[in-house]
A protein has these predicted regions:
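C-terminal motif of bacterial Sec signal peptides marking the signal peptidase cleavage site
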Residues: 9-12
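Bacterial signal peptide processing site
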Residues: 14-16
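Tryptophan-anchored aromatic micro-motifs
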Residues: 20-36
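N-terminal glycine/threonine-rich, aromatic-flanked beta-hairpin/loop signature
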Residues: 38-66
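Short, exposed beta-strand-loop hairpins at the edges of beta-sheets
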Residues: 52, 100-118
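An anionic, turn-rich surface loop/hairpin at beta-sheet edges
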Residues: 73-96
Length: 121
């Protein structure tokens, strides 16, 4: 019984690592599914701009940091009504060279997606 108590106690004290400041700027890769196809994106982010490279397509978005682990992106040159909507990104966990995050259109809490970005520079 004491052993079970200790396991539960230590498990409840575990906090996922979140060194978000290490991933505020840099060059990253993110792989996701789009229309049943795997797409690899490379993006470069500084404190205020995110430049996303997908194939030969380049998208630029402004970045507004809410706190160390959360930011809002807005495309600077949206080509559709959907692209005009801001995207909220929250870093959930970090490790040595990557972070896991969730993202959604601002205000759409029902359709959150998750992904992992790897820092390459």
């Amino acid at each position: 019984m004491t052993c079970i108590f200790l396991v539960v106690l230590f498990a409840s004290c575990y906090n996922a690592e979140r060194n978000c400041e290490d991933f505020r700027t840099g060059t990253f890769e993110f792989t996701y599914m789009l229309d049943g196809k795997e797409v690899r994106s490379r993006f470069v982010r500084n404190d205020s701009i995110n430049i996303d490279y997908v194939g030969e397509h380049i998208d630029t978005a402004s970045v507004s940091w809410v706190n160390d682990c959360e930011f809002i992106m807005r495309k600077l040159h949206p080509s559709s009504m959907r692209e005009r909507k801001a995207v909220q990104v929250k870093i959930l966990t970090t490790d040595e060279n990557s972070y896991t995050f969730e993202y959604s259109i601002v205000g759409d809490n029902k359709n959150k997606q998750r992904g992992t970005a790897v820092k390459i520079e």
